[in-house]
Every structure is written in C-alpha cells, then in structure tokens.
C-alpha cells in the first residue's frame, strides 16, 4: 500500500529552479558572477571550522548587525533561510485554511507554492500591459478573507519597480489588518530611490523582505531577513523552523554587512550592463520592459520555450516562463555579449518573431 500524503499536493506545482550544465553560460537564476570578498571568505572559513556546533537559532549577532545597519530595533528584525523562507513563514503566520494571499501575476514563482502548501488560497491579479503591478486592481480585489499581499518590487521576472507614491496610494487603500510584504530581493539594483524601509516606518502592516542572495553574493548560503512591526516579527518566530539559518550563513551575512560599501559598489557595474543589454535588445527590435533589477525580460508569449531552448543550444541558459516570457540574468560583459550574439542572430529573431533587419 502506498503511504498516504495530502491529496491536494497533487495539484501544487513544485518550484522549479534555473537549470545549469557544465560549460554553459548560466543567465537563468539571477546570481551575481562575483564571489564573496576576502573578508567574507575568511568569515565563512572560520565558521565552517566549528561546523560541529549548532548555529544560534536566535540569530542574535546577525539581527543586531542588521538592526544597526538599517537603524531599526532588533525587535523589528527576523532572519530566514533566504527571503523565500520568510515568505512561507509569513503565510503561516497570517493565514488559516481558506484565507487569501494576493499577489500579481506573473511574479515570483514561489508565492503560489508557499500559499497553497499552507492551505491558503492564492488570489492573482494580472500585471498591466507594461508588465507592472496593477495596484488599483489589487486594492479592489481585497476581501474579508485577504490576510497577506506580496508586492515584488522590482518585480521578478518582469523587472519594473514601483514608485514611493504608487505604494503610498496602495497602502492607504488597503485595510490595516492586511499584511503587505514588500519583496525587495533586488533592492540593491534599483536606482529609482524607492525604499521599503521608509514605508515600514509609516505603515505598521508593512513587512520589508530582503536577501543576501543577490547583490551580496551569498545565494549558496541561504540567508535573508524581514523588517517589520515587532508583533509580526514575534509571530514569525513561532513558525520558524529551528536551525535553518546555518552558522556559516550567519557569519557570512555579518561580514557582508561590514563590507557593504564595497559589495554594493559592484551593483553599479551590473546596472550599467543591464542598461547596455536592454538598449541592444531594443535596437534589435525586441520588446523589453523597463528593469530595475539584475535581469531583463522578453515577453515572447508562446515562443518563450523555443527561444530558451535555442539559446541553451547556443550555450547560454535563460529562464523561460511558460507561455509568458523569458528572463535573462545580467552576467559579466562577455556572458552578456554571448547572449546578445544569440539574440540578434537570424535564428533567434525568427523564433521571437522579430523582424530581421538588412
């Protein structure tokens, strides 16, 4: 007899990460191509030497470092194994069975997964024609069962960020009882000036989610954080799985904050490359939404899978999203040039239905 598991899991699609294979240029997972700084590598080595010891489940030193870095109280900081784990914890902390979690679509693929695993109901609101959050439609979709709203800004995978005024108007329209999570995983690449922490200080229902996986280059160690009202942080601590943020990750994150100036200076190069790649794609005839992150997006619709497969054959791995589009991570200049060589080829333009110029 087959062991019994939850029957509703058959209807839940598991999160699918970006693919990789030896020798390929991987522009599929929004990773930075630069490794940790020497000081961070030293912290990693020191922590690894004590791998026989359990990590600090209270994340005391890391929380203190985050609080000091951003000028908030330690009671306002929660830590998780990447910001995606905090997304899941937020659903568990806010929702009972049948409660609603709202988010735009297409947005971060983990949102529907963590929602349904918790027994909550995902409510999706389509993006606008320019691949941005339709905040008016989202505000109008709030019901008595809405408990949590994820707002990914810059939006993954489409790229645009929301302005402060847009978010203020949205937050003013959403009931205070609804938790609004501003998922700012790509905050460090956003040059618009919008900072979720400014909104956290004015709206007690705002949670700011950030990560050390992207600009800080610690994707392999899995550490992220939430800044929120103390009551929300206390609730997160009750649904947190013990010891999931390991000692190496905590030490690396503390060292990364200490070196944040040098690490964040790297993002200027990524932003410059992002703009260069987008301009080249626009010049080649592609539709490319504005991006405030470390990637660009091609809304190729039903051609997305074929485009991604052809790029992989050319040695460049991208991230297709069903029949919606393809996301391209900004890599090193040489990696970006390899992608552009493919994207401007006759084959790629034919697949994408982009006119081949004489």
From Swiss-Prot:
Enzyme Commission number(s): 2.6.1.57
Q: Which UniProt keywords apply?
A: Aminotransferase, Pyridoxal phosphate, Transferase
List the GO molecular function terms: aromatic-amino-acid transaminase activity; histidinol-phosphate transaminase activity; pyridoxal phosphate binding
Question: PROSITE patterns attached here?
Answer: AA_TRANSFER_CLASS_2
Question: Please, one GO biological process term?
Answer: L-histidine biosynthetic process
Q: State if tRNA-binding is listed as a keyword.
A: no
Domain of life where this protein originates: Bacteria
Q: Which residues carry this modification: N6-(pyridoxal phosphate)lysine?
A: 214
The record's section on Gene3D superfamilies has: Aspartate Aminotransferase, domain 1, Type I PLP-dependent aspartate aminotransferase-like (Major domain)
Query: Could you tell me what reaction this enzyme catalyses?
Result: an aromatic L-alpha-amino acid + 2-oxoglutarate = an aromatic oxo-acid + L-glutamate
Q: Which cofactor does it need?
A: pyridoxal 5'-phosphate
This protein's record includes keyword Transferase: yes
Class of this enzyme: transferase
Describe the subunit structure: Homodimer.
Family, according to the entry, reads as follows: Belongs to the class-II pyridoxal-phosphate-dependent aminotransferase family.
Q: What does this protein do?
A: Aminotransferase that catalyzes the conversion of aromatic amino acids and 2-oxoglutarate into corresponding aromatic oxo acids and L-glutamate.
Designated name of the protein: Aromatic amino acid aminotransferase
Which species does the entry assign this protein to?
Answer: Rhodococcus opacus (strain B4)
């Amino acid at each position: 007899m087959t062991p019994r598991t939850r029957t509703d899991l058959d209807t839940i699609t598991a999160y699918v990460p970006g693919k990789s294979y030896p020798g390929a240029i991987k522009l599929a997972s929004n990773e930075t191509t630069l490794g940790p700084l020497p000081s961070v590598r030293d912290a990693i080595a020191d922590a690894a030497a004590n791998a026989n010891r359990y990590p600090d489940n209270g994340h005391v030193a890391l929380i203190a470092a985050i609080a000091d870095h951003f000028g908030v109280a330690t009671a306002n900081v929660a830590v998780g194994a990447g910001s995606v784990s905090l997304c899941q914890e937020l659903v568990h902390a806010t929702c009972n069975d049948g409660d609603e979690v709202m988010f735009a679509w297409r947005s971060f693929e983990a949102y529907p997964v963590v929602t349904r695993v918790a027994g909550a109901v995902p409510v999706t609101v389509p993006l606008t024609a320019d691949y941005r959050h339709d905040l008016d439609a989202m505000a109008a979709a709030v019901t008595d069962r809405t408990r949590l709203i994820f707002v990914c800004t810059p939006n993954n995978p489409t790229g645009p960020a929301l302005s402060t005024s847009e978010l203020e108007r949205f937050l003013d329209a959403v009931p205070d009882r609804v938790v609004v999570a501003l998922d700012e995983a790509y905050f460090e690449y956003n040059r618009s000036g919008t900072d979720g922490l400014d909104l956290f200080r004015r709206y007690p229902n705002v949670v700011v989610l950030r990560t050390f996986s992207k600009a800080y280059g610690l994707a392999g160690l899995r550490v992220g954080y939430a800044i929120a009202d103390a009551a929300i942080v206390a609730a997160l601590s009750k649904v947190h799985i013990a010891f999931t943020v390991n000692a190496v990750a905590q030490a690396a994150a503390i060292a990364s904050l200490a070196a944040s100036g040098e690490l964040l200076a790297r993002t200027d190069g990524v932003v410059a490359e992002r703009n260069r790649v987008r301009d080249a794609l626009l010049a080649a005839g592609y539709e490319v939404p504005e991006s405030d992150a470390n990637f660009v997006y091609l809304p190729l619709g039903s051609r997305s899978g074929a485009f991604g497969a052809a790029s992989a054959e050319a040695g460049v791995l991208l991230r297709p999203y069903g029949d919606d589009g393809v996301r391209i991570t900004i890599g090193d200049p040489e990696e970006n040039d390899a992608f552009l060589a493919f994207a401007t080829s006759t084959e790629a333009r034919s697949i994408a239905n982009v006119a081949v110029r004489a």
